[in-house]
Amino acid sequence: MAPKSNKNQENINSKLALTIKSGKYTLGYKSVVKSLRTGKAKLVIIAANTPVLRKSELEYYAMLSKTPVYYFQGGNNELGTVCGKLFRVGTLSILDAGDSDILSSI
């Protein structure tokens, strides 16, 4: 079963990279909460090593705004690398997917 989940993770990684190149997104806890509160977020991605309290707050705001949440398998270092950034990314919200079909695949 591990190869299937690994392939699925690579598929999500490539779709996320395409979204970063062609769509609109916000990085970081404060901007993700702001996009959830205003209703602009279409998808929230949370890294695996995000603190529990922060994760539960994001889940709460996502539940209020009826926004889907995806739990990234890797830590915030890996999520930052997938996004093409040289820093850690704990949370990100996708405002517009651009050319990617990540919203329908998750």
Curated annotation (Swiss-Prot):
Q: Where is it predominantly found? A: cytoplasm
Database matches in InterPro entries? Ribosomal_eL30-like, Ribosomal_eL30-like_sf, Ribosomal_eL30_CS, Ribosomal_eL8/eL30/eS12/Gad45
Q: Would I find Cytoplasm among this entry's keywords?
A: yes
What would you give as a GO molecular function for this chain, any one?
pre-mRNA 5'-splice site binding
- Biological processes per GO annotation: negative regulation of mRNA splicing, via spliceosome; rRNA processing
Which SUPFAM superfamilies does the annotation name?
Answer: L30e-like
The record's keywords, sorted A to Z, are: Cytoplasm, Ribonucleoprotein, Ribosomal protein
Q: Name one GO cellular component term.
A: cytosolic large ribosomal subunit
Write one Pfam family the protein is assigned to. Answer: Ribosomal_L7Ae
Subcellular localization, per the record? Answer: Cytoplasm
Similarity-based family: Belongs to the eukaryotic ribosomal protein eL30 family.
What is the protein's known function?
Component of the ribosome, a large ribonucleoprotein complex responsible for the synthesis of proteins in the cell. The small ribosomal subunit (SSU) binds messenger RNAs (mRNAs) and translates the encoded message by selecting cognate aminoacyl-transfer RNA (tRNA) molecules. The large subunit (LSU) contains the ribosomal catalytic site termed the peptidyl transferase center (PTC), which catalyzes the formation of peptide bonds, thereby polymerizing the amino acids delivered by tRNAs into a polypeptide chain.
Q: How does it assemble?
A: Component of the large ribosomal subunit. Mature ribosomes consist of a small (40S) and a large (60S) subunit. The 40S subunit contains about 32 different proteins and 1 molecule of RNA (18S). The 60S subunit contains 45 different proteins and 3 molecules of RNA (25S, 5.8S and 5S).
Q: What is this protein called?
A: Large ribosomal subunit protein eL30
Q: What is the lineage of its organism?
A: Eukaryota, Fungi, Dikarya, Ascomycota, Saccharomycotina
